[in-house]
């Protein structure tokens, strides 16, 4: 089960996400995706990895859709005071029909769903390209996304294609067209 395997990676933002990113890349390649990984070191010199996977349809529809892109992140917040079932937040536990573990909601559950969807939809059935994008350091300032924008050729290709995008962040099971985020600005005011 993909979700159980994803939860088992202790990919806390303060540590490297290399192992989970390599696992995602291998899983995408097994599903027929071409994969690009971009690596960087964070401010503590910890290795971080972003993943962009793209699978083209076997037969592209003429004037077909621009494609579909799923976005996820591989890091989770620390689990210092784990109150879920079991004693280890990175050992998935099923209790009363629910799966518990660090990241099961934000956002390893969404990533597992994305991988399952890609597996269910064969490249033969696709009408446009399919992307799955995973960034590092979303929980600590979106550093992975910023790095990907500057250094990923595969991401630039995705942007140029203007696909329909879904970001799998938790929204209490409601479909939303916008979500909380962050904006940085520099404002200069000249007074008298």
Label each PLM-derived region with a short phrase.
Residues 105:
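Loop-rich non-cytosolic ectodomains and luminal regions
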Residues 4, 34-37, 48, 62, ...:
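Context-gated lysine
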Residues 1-102, 123-127:
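Acidic/His- and Gly-rich active-site-bordering loop/insert found
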Residues 52, 56-58, 77, 108, ...:
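Intrinsic disorder/low-complexity detector
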Residues 96-99, 109-117, 122-192:
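Fold-level recognition of mixed alpha/beta catalytic cores in primary-metabolism enzymes, strongest
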